[in-house]
């Protein structure tokens, strides 16, 4: 008789919750709401470096901006230059952790790169120059402020840049994290 009571209980529940049931039911919507998990915020920035492309979050901390993701990437932009990059894997074996310092020498700036165990080299740069230009978008364009800096690595002339919108909010960075490699780009994903 216990089995019969269970059947009656299940039928009662079905009648209670199943009444007026249709393809779109209030009961089903309520259950979805209870068990639905919010996936949370989505990263709005893209980091690119030598074939690696990662979506990252931008976290403002006073004058600094930290770019990070759940895979362990952390880039510290102090508002003037990137001074630290951690957790980037250009290949599956080694994680790169690089510290960057800037010193002024005469009318130039020297960026020094250091890995976890050794110095990686230096880059000599002219003072930054600011200009206004148009940035092409998928639809139309937007006027931006571009701060560029010409640099010399061994015998190569290279460029670093900071792109700001007209209210001087960051839109993109192009910088060197290692003097022997290509530049890193971090940009707002909507551009």
Protein language model features and the residues they cover:
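Mid-chain, structured segments of secreted extracytoplasmic proteins
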Residues: 71-102
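C-terminal motif of bacterial Sec signal peptides marking the signal peptidase cleavage site
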Residues: 18-20
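Sec-dependent N-terminal signal peptides
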Residues: 8-16
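Acidic, serine/threonine-rich low-complexity disordered tracts
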Residues: 22-75, 100-191
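Positively charged, low-complexity intrinsically disordered regions
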Residues: 7-8, 56, 85, 188
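Bacterial N-terminal signal peptides that target proteins for export
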Residues: 1-9
């Amino acid at each position: 008789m216990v089995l019969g009571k269970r059947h009656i209980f299940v039928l009662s529940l079905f009648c209670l919750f199943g009444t007026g049931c249709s393809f779109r039911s209030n009961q089903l919507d309520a259950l979805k709401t209870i068990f639905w998990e919010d996936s949370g915020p989505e990263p709005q920035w893209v980091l690119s470096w030598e074939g690696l492309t990662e979506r990252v979050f931008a976290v403002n901390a006073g004058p600094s901006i930290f770019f990070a993701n759940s895979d362990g990437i952390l880039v510290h932009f102090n508002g003037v230059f990137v001074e630290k990059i951690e957790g980037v894997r250009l290949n599956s074996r080694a994680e790169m952790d690089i510290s960057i310092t800037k010193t002024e020498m005469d009318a130039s700036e020297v960026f020094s790169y250091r890995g976890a165990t050794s110095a990686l080299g230096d880059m000599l740069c002219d003072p930054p120059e600011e200009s206004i230009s148009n940035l092409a978008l998928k639809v139309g364009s937007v006027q931006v402020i571009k701060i560029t800096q010409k640099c010399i690595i061994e015998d190569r002339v290279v460029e670093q840049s900071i792109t700001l919108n007209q209210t001087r909010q960051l839109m993109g960075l192009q910088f060197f994290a290692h003097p022997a490699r290509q530049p890193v780009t971090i940009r707002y994903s909507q551009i």
